[in-house]
């Protein structure tokens, strides 16, 4: 084994298995790209992104940790969201929640 090496189990690894998902359509109405990270509270993303923010409350992107989705200007795309886990408390971001969901 090499220091820092990760040896994964054989076969497919399913991320976020068993979590409830919701798909929403997101459009970038701005003139600049917007990138959203894997653990960002999606309802609080850039106001230039147009989507159902109520449906996104308490959710994050269903993508691998440490990755992001980029929305180019004028682009519309579907994304899949999953619930935030743990204590389900949100602090920071755009300061729209600042506590329990």
Curated annotation (Swiss-Prot):
EC primary class: hydrolase
Keyword match Hydrolase: yes
UniProt-listed Gene3D superfamilies: Urease, beta subunit
EC number: 3.5.1.5
A molecular function (GO) term: urease activity
CDD domains in the record: Urease_beta
Gene Ontology, cellular component aspect: urease complex
Entry's localization field: Cytoplasm
One GO BP: urea catabolic process
Biological or metabolic pathway of the protein: Nitrogen metabolism; urea degradation; CO(2) and NH(3) from urea (urease route): step 1/1
Keyword Cytoplasm: yes
HAMAP family: Urease_beta (MF_01954)
Protein name: Urease subunit beta
Record lineage: Bacteria, Pseudomonadati, Pseudomonadota, Alphaproteobacteria, Hyphomicrobiales
Gene that this polypeptide is encoded by: ureB
């Amino acid at each position: 084994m090499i220091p820092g090496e990760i040896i994964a189990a054989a076969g497919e690894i399913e991320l976020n298995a068993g979590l409830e998902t919701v798909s929403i359509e997101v459009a970038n109405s701005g003139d600049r790209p917007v990138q959203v990270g894997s653990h960002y509270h999606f309802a609080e993303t850039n106001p230039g992104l147009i989507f159902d923010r109520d449906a996104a409350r308490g959710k994050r992107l269903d993508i691998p940790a440490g990755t992001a989705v980029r929305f180019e200007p004028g682009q519309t795309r579907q994304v899949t969201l999953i619930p935030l886990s743990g204590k389900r408390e949100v602090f920071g971001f755009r300061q729209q929640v600042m506590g329990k969901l």
